[in-house]
From Swiss-Prot:
InterPro entries the UniProt entry points to: MFS (IPR011701), MFS_trans_sf (IPR036259)
Any one GO CC term of the record: apical plasma membrane
MF-aspect GO terms: symporter activity
Protein role: May function as a sodium-dependent glucose transporter. Potential channels for urea in the inner medulla of kidney.
Name used for this protein in its record: Sodium-dependent glucose transporter 1
Domain of life: Eukaryota
TM segment ranges: 77-97, 115-137, 144-161, 166-186, 205-225, 269-289, 311-331, 349-371, 393-413, 439-459, 467-487
CDD domains in the record: MFS_NaGLT1_MFSD4B
Listed GO biological process terms: sodium ion transport
Gene expressing this chain: mfsd4b
């Protein structure tokens, strides 16, 4: 045999199969692997629709959540504006009672000391409304519920000047307190449900609106519609104007008093009219926006709750008890402290009081911008450091004028962000439902009632010590110890990944990283399944022999005896050669190239 004839030739070997196996294999391919291919196609379509990008070498996928259209964003901004307007009215409605309390007592023919129980009635209604709102908010449309709460507040505020009996005024104030409690609870939950992980700045704006309303209400009550001397008003008003006012406002002459005008009542009417307009806005939102709330849910459709959900809610409510109680106590008694203990003039003490509330409102305004770039936990830590340092300095330098002014401003700014930041912080670890928000508000309301009353009782018995500063230091220390405990419960070891992120949704968000990891694992699994399906489903294949003499000369090129015996039918499409060198197989897969 010549060397040319001994050279290996290219051979094509095709395995034959029975015709009856064709339908069986096709059916097997359709039934076993079609779903896997469909899953991959569906995954690709989801990635395409969600604008997911798989970067080679990075192992990361950018996930852009659906439902973030421009129209949806506009509606969410409208809800935020409506909530801010409602909290502006809430702040005005709560704080207007103080500047007009003496006028209300005159209107119902009572002394101030005999009418103080209306504060208790309103506070009791506020707590009851918070609990009621927390229950109803999980079952009733939030826009409709807040609309009715604002409507009740509007009618209560407008009807307050018309109350001629003390018990009627107390009942009315209690009903207004109920509606305020519903509004306070529902507003905090709705802003979380509307914005989700982006709720931080909007939560700060919500509570800034409340502070702005509380700041503006005394101005409306006293500067715009303040009580003027009766003789002065008589000299300025013509007889025709006086008769007109008497005809329209017959209640302006209380029984047993001389002719007196009550212009302060217009403050209640103006506030009531404003709240009424906001309630109409919420009714409009009810008819324009679907009832679906954006609660955070898992893939199974259930809300996500922390393992220590109940403990977190109770401890955070205790945290708010001391925080709000200290805030109200300082704002209520700093005037008395400056006048009696530091021996300030009344104007200086009033300026110190105004400095605290002004710094408080300014801090909440600045927190809107800081919340967009800082984590809520960071804001809480900064607040705790500020309150602790300022209260410690106030205790050490309790009679130092410059230190008193500087630390009062620092204390007001530090206290401003704690409540909204606390709600935003706990929302990252567990779902804040209506009941949870109700517990927060009730804790804050109880602190507002208990700590100022306790401080007032102590001041009546101990007058030579700066009890106000001691109270602020104790509450700041307690909250500084309690917050690390809350953080430990919320982020136990091995589960420190946040469920949601605050601020903008970026590639480093914890929840997006979970989605990316899930998508990557699914894609790898689908690729493996598809590869296996392609290998197993192809019963027809060709084995192409390479023009490689060394391959045929290798002793490993001969197939094992059992493999050669298992070949059902071989059709040679070439000149025959020696049988041992005819075929070569790989044990990995029947679809290999030799």
């Amino acid at each position: 045999m010549s060397p040319a004839e001994a050279a290996p030739r290219k051979k094509h070997v095709r395995f034959a199969r029975m015709e009856g196996d064709v339908d069986h294999d096709d059916q097997e391919e359709n039934t076993l692997f079609d779903k896997q291919k469909d899953v991959k196609e569906g995954l690709k379509s989801v990635l395409k629709g969600g604008k997911g990008i798989l970067s080679q070498g990075s192992g990361q996928v950018d996930v852009v959540r659906p439902g973030r259209s421009k129209t949806g964003t506009c509606w969410r901004w409208l809800v935020s504006l409506a909530l801010c307007a409602s909290f502006l009215g809430l702040g005005m409605a709560i704080s207007v009672l103080g500047p007009t309390f003496e006028d209300l007592a005159i209107n119902v023919n009572k002394n101030i000391s005999n009418l103080s129980y209306i504060f208790v009635g309103r506070a009791s209604g506020y707590i009851g409304g918070s609990l009621l709102g927390g229950i109803l908010f999980d079952f009733v449309n939030p826009h409709l519920l807040l609309g009715f709460a604002l409507l009740t507040t509007a009618f209560g505020m407008s009807g307050t000047p018309f109350c001629k009996k003390a018990w009627v005024l107390t009942v009315l104030m209690s009903s207004v307190g109920v509606s305020m409690g519903v509004l306070d609870t529902g507003g905090n939950v709705l802003i979380l449900n509307t914005w989700g992980e982006q709720a931080g700045p909007h939560m700060q704006a919500l509570h800034f609106s409340f502070a702005a309303g509380a700041f503006a209400s005394p101005i409306i009550a006293k500067l715009l519609f303040g009580h003027h001397n009766s003789s002065t008003n008589t000299s300025l008003m013509s007889g025709h104007a006086s008769k007109t006012i008497d005809a329209v406002l017959p209640f302006s002459h209380p029984k047993g008093t001389s002719t007196i005008d009550l212009p302060w009542m217009w403050a209640y009417i103006v506030i009531g009219a404003f709240v009424l307009l906001v309630s109409l806005l919420f009714f409009s939102l009810y008819f324009c926006i679907s009832t679906n709330s954006n609660r955070t849910k898992t893939a199974s459709g259930k809300q996500q709750f922390s393992k220590h959900h109940n403990t977190l809610i109770i401890l955070l409510s205790m945290f708010f008890f001391f925080y709000v109680g200290s805030e109200v106590a300082y704002g209520s008694f700093i005037f008395t402290y400056g006048k009696d203990y530091v021996h300030m003039e009344e104007t200086e003490a009033a300026g110190l009081n105004s400095l605290f509330w002004g710094a408080f409102a300014a801090g909440r305004g600045l927190a809107i911008f800081f919340a967009a770039c800082l984590h809520p936990g960071t804001l809480i830590l900064l607040s705790l450091v500020g309150t602790t340092v300022s209260s410690l300095l106030l205790c050490l330098f309790s009679q130092n004028y410059p230190m008193l002014w500087a630390c009062t401003a620092l204390y007001g700014i530090s206290m401003s962000t704690t409540f909204p930041s606390g709600i935003s912080w706990v929302e990252q670890y567990t779902t804040v439902t209506g009941r949870s928000a109700a517990i927060f508000v009730v804790g804050a309301a109880l602190g507002e009632m208990v700590l100022p009353a306790l401080l007032g009782f102590l001041l009546g018995h101990v007058q030579n010590y700066p009890l106000l500063m001691y109270l602020t230091l104790c509450t700041a220390t307690f909250t500084s110890i309690l917050f690390p405990v809350l953080y430990k419960l919320a982020s136990p070891e091995g589960n420190v990944t946040l469920r949601k992120s605050s601020g903008k949704c970026t590639i480093k968000d914890a929840d997006d990283s979970e989605y990316r990891q899930a998508l990557l694992e699914n894609m790898e699994e689908q690729e493996e399944n598809e590869s296996e399906a392609d290998l197993c489903n192809d019963a027809d294949f060709e084995v192409i022999e390479m023009d490689d003499a060394s391959l045929l000369s290798s002793p490993k090129s001969s197939p094992p005896a059992d493999v050669a015996a298992s070949v059902p039918d071989v059709h040679l499409v070439a000149s025959p050669l020696s049988e041992p060198n005819m075929l070569s197989f790989s044990t990995d897969s029947p679809r290999s190239k030799l």
